[in-house]
């Protein structure tokens, strides 16, 4: 089933028993987090808080709290058993878009042309009088405190906007970038835009600051987009394809867009049926900035982007299960807020796995597999355990062909997608080991690994800024474990032969099993 907007998706989830309305008053400060966390850990439904304490906007939480709801959001109507396989089909689509196979026949050429036509046909279209601009706040009416922005954890620095799709464009690009970056509320119309240096929004901003120093940088933030667009923003879409086009492919209908209303931001387009849109700028720093608080990291001084307004962000509880350190990020000044009538505020929380980002990671893991297999045909399976904070550990299953092959795969994974830049640990196993079963993975590590021979350590590599275990923020080491059977040249000893029961005996016991009454 395809969904034209968030409300359509909510209605469908409610009919399926996948969404529960909460009519009792619940505070966005801590209480929603506790409720959502308990429900998510139990595999429960999405929650729509109809009466958030002190606010008039309903709050939607846990929307993608199960892999099945992620698949439904991508337009795949599958039962729980078929969900992961359906997500791999989406990965195959992305793989074909990223690197099409050369056609081997007229039939293959026809398929390639059909795919190209489908992508072309799904180019977004601009509409007039969009629902997302039914209500407009301008001037003194712009007040972010009117929105039920969650404060998720007791030690958080303040309310945090979490599910905003940030729309940016670089100075030399026609394609808009969609990214999800958390944003700390620091004033009536001020948010801190926490985008890490390698993310698309930060790259667009730096390029703009270099080409147009001292000019305000336009930004739009979308709250409550349709599920295909929201999930497109967290999917590794090829650079040649916009997230809006990919959302159209998932939805089976072109994404309808609206031009922003604010002069200077009207170069950006947002989903026409979004619930709430924030329009504004990152402004150049006016005058000398205030000195950094005692004990805080120094203000950024290098690069053209350093000349823009920055503020100290955090600390916040994060997907690691810890509060992160404070750091400087640009300030986003909101000039205008547009919304639908009876708008819904979409939110989430992050914390020790499992949380909603971890569930998204489990689902997107299946999208990654065909992409990896396209580049590395020897990879037979791939798993990012949610306990590893979504991406910090990867287990790779491969068909090994020569000595040293596992190490080649490690370095290939680390360098393939931006999403794997921050993967600290990679364990490589053979085809006989189920990468989703910790018992089998631990067995392979403890029986097939010599720590000195089979451990790869790489120093001074990019690492997640939130990883406080690294000695320097943003720079740390990586470790690979070769837990495959060793080939000649990798060991001088006779390798162990796995124990396996005789097939005829197993068949005999299968027949006896029921007779004995053990089943």
Swiss-Prot record:
rRNA processing recorded as keyword: no
Gene Ontology terms: cellular component: cytosol; plasma membrane
Reactions this protein catalyses: a 4-hydroxy-3-(all-trans-polyprenyl)benzoate + H(+) = a 2-(all-trans-polyprenyl)phenol + CO2
Compartments where found: Cell membrane
GO molecular function: 3-octaprenyl-4-hydroxybenzoate carboxy-lyase activity; metal ion binding
InterPro entries according to UniProt: UbiD (IPR002830), UbiD-like_C (IPR049381), UbiD-like_N (IPR049383), UbiD_bacteria (IPR023677), UbiD_Rift_dom (IPR048304)
Keywords from the UniProt entry: Cell membrane, Decarboxylase, Flavoprotein, FMN, Lyase, Manganese, Membrane, Metal-binding, Ubiquinone biosynthesis
Biological process terms in GO annotation: ubiquinone biosynthetic process
Membrane topology summary: Peripheral membrane protein
EC number(s) on file: 4.1.1.98
Residues that, per the record, bind prenylated FMN: 180-182, 194-196, 199-200
Regions crossing the membrane: none
NCBIfam families linked: UbiD family decarboxylase
Cited function: Catalyzes the decarboxylation of 3-octaprenyl-4-hydroxy benzoate to 2-octaprenylphenol, an intermediate step in ubiquinone biosynthesis.
PANTHER family to which the protein is assigned, alphabetical: 3-OCTAPRENYL-4-HYDROXYBENZOATE CARBOXY-LYASE-RELATED, FERULIC ACID DECARBOXYLASE 1
Subunit structure: Homohexamer.
Protein name: 3-octaprenyl-4-hydroxybenzoate carboxy-lyase
Natural source organism: Burkholderia thailandensis (strain ATCC 700388 / DSM 13276 / CCUG 48851 / CIP 106301 / E264)
Lineage of source species: Bacteria, Pseudomonadati, Pseudomonadota, Betaproteobacteria, Burkholderiales
């Amino acid at each position: 089933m395809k969904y034209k907007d968030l409300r359509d998706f909510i209605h469908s989830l409610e009919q399926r028993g996948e969404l529960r309305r909460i009519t009792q008053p619940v505070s966005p400060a801590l209480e929603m987090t506790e409720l959502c966390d308990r429900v998510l850990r139990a595999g429960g439904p999405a929650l729509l808080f109809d009466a958030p304490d002190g606010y008039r906007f309903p709050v939607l939480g846990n929307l993608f709290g199960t892999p099945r709801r992620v698949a439904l959001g991508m337009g795949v109507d599958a039962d729980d058993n078929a969900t992961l396989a359906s997500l791999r089909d989406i990965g195959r689509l992305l793989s074909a878009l990223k690197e099409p196979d050369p056609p081997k026949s007229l039939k293959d050429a026809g398929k390639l042309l059909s795919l190209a036509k489908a992508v072309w046909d799904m180019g977004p279209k601009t509409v007039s009088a969009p629902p997302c601009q039914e209500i407009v706040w301008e001037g003194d009416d712009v007040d972010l405190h009117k929105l039920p922005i969650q404060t998720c954890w007791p030690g958080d620095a303040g309310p945090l906007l979490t599910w905003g799709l940030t729309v940016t464009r670089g100075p030399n690009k026609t394609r808009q970038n969609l990214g999800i970056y958390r944003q700390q509320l620091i004033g009536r119309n001020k948010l801190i835009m926490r985008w890490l240096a390698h993310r698309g929004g930060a790259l667009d901003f730096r390029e703009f600051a270099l080409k147009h120093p001292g000019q305000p940088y336009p930004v739009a933030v979308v709250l409550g987009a349709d599920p295909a667009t929201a999930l497109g923003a967290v999917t590794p879409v090829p650079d040649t394809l916009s997230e809006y086009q990919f959302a159209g492919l998932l939805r089976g209908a072109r994404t309808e867009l609206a031009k922003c209303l604010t002069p200077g931001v009207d170069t950006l387009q947002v989903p026409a049926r979004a619930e709430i849109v924030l329009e504004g700028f990152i402004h150049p720093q006016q005058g000398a900035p205030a000195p950094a608080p005692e004990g805080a990291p120094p203000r950024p001084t290098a690069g053209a982007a350093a000349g823009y307004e920055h503020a100290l962000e955090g600390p916040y509880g994060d997907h690691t299960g810890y509060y992160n350190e404070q750091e400087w990020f640009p300030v986003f000044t909101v000039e205008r807020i547009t919304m639908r009538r009876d708008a819904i505020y979409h939110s989430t929380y992050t914390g020790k796995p499992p949380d909603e980002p971890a569930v998204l990671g489990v689902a997107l893991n299946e999208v990654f597999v065909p992409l990896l297999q396209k580049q590395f045909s020897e990879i037979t399976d791939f798993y990012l355990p949610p306990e590893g904070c979504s991406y910090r550990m990867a287990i790779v299953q491969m068909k090994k062909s020569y000595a040293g092959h596992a190490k080649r795969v490690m370095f290939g994974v680390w360098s393939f997608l931006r999403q794997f830049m921050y993967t600290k640990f990679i364990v490589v196993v053979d085809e006989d080991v189920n990468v989703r079963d910790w018992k089998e993975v631990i067995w392979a590590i403890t029986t097939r690994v010599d720590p000195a021979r089979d451990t790869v350590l790489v120093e001074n590599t990019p690492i997640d800024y939130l990883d406080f275990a690294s000695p320097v923020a943003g720079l740390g080491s990586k470790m690979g474990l070769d837990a495959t059977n060793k080939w000649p040249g990798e060991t001088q000893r006779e390798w162990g032969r796995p124990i396996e029961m005789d097939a005829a005996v197993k068949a005999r016991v299968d027949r006896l099993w029921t007779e004995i009454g053990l089943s």
